[in-house]
Curated annotation (Swiss-Prot):
Located at the 30S-50S ribosomal subunit interface and binds directly to 23S ribosomal RNA. Gene3D superfamilies: 2.30.30.790. Transmembrane segments: none annotated. Its main location: plastid. It comes from the Eukaryota. The keyword Translocase does not apply. Part of the 50S ribosomal subunit. It is found in: Plastid, Chloroplast. NCBIfam families: rplS_bact. Keywords: Chloroplast, Plastid, Ribonucleoprotein, Ribosomal protein, RNA-binding, rRNA-binding, Transit peptide. It comes from Arabidopsis thaliana (Mouse-ear cress). This is Large ribosomal subunit protein bL19cz.
Length: 225
């Protein structure tokens, strides 16, 4: 290749110039005859740099070619990126369809929920048979209780409500009264079928939820008319 470049100027000097024939064409033909083993693309590109006005149309610059190649590569990468984004969107849509296709699970009912439902139903049935008034701590109530041994006889208990224990169908109240100077406390389940009637005689406002302090107070604080 080096020898061919040294022969190029000699060939140009040996060939006489003709005014009618352009020396550029002669230089191109002599160069091709002296260097037949060279790559035609490389020779044409280099000759076009030396002779920008060639009639053969080989005036494409290497920089333009590089820019063309880079632009082509950029176009290919953009097309590939668009295809990749489209594939990702398709896969996401398929995943969403699969997720939507799964059947929804029914909520599990725990044992505590079952017991709460049963208690609520039992309370509704008991209130239909015998309505229960609103009882609060400090109220004075009168309870008519049926004696199991003698169902014709009703025992009446009257006292002050010391506390109330909420437990669904097993809700209880504690009543205190003074009998012969001694404090007596009785616990009644308000939804018991043996209780025939519960009547609130009077309401009293108290600050505490449990009046256990009455055990240590004077009996007159636990008495009522």
């Amino acid at each position: 290749m080096a020898m061919s470049f040294h022969r190029l100027p000699q060939a140009l000097h040996m060939i006489p110039r003709n005014p009618t024939q352009s020396s550029k064409n002669l230089g191109f033909s002599s160069f091709l005859s002296c260097a037949p083993s060279m790559d035609s693309r490389i020779s044409v590109s280099r000759l076009s740099l030396n002779h920008p006005g060639s009639k053969f149309g080989f005036s494409l610059d290497t920089r333009v070619r590089n820019e063309f190649i880079v632009r082509a590569e950029e176009g290919n990468t953009e097309a590939e990126s668009e295809e990749f984004v489209a594939e990702i969107a398709d896969t996401e849509g398929n995943v969403e369809e699969v997720v939507e296709a799964k059947p929804t699970r029914k909520p599990r009912i725990k044992l505590g929920d079952v017991m709460g439902i049963l208690n609520q139903k039992a309370i509704e049935v008991a209130e239909k048979v015998r309505p229960v008034p609103e009882i609060r701590t400090g109220d004075i109530v009168e309870i008519k209780l049926e004696v199991p041994e003698n169902k014709r006889r009703l025992s009446i208990y009257k006292g002050i409500v010391m506390s109330r224990q909420n437990a669904g169908i097993h809700t209880t109240i504690r009543i205190r009264r003074i009998i012969a100077g001694i404090g007596v406390e009785i616990v009644f389940p308000i939804y018991s079928p043996n209780i025939k009637e519960i009547k609130v005689v009077s309401h009293r406002k108290v600050r505490r939820a449990r009046l256990y302090y009455l055990r240590d107070k004077l009996p007159r604080l636990s008495t009522f008319k």
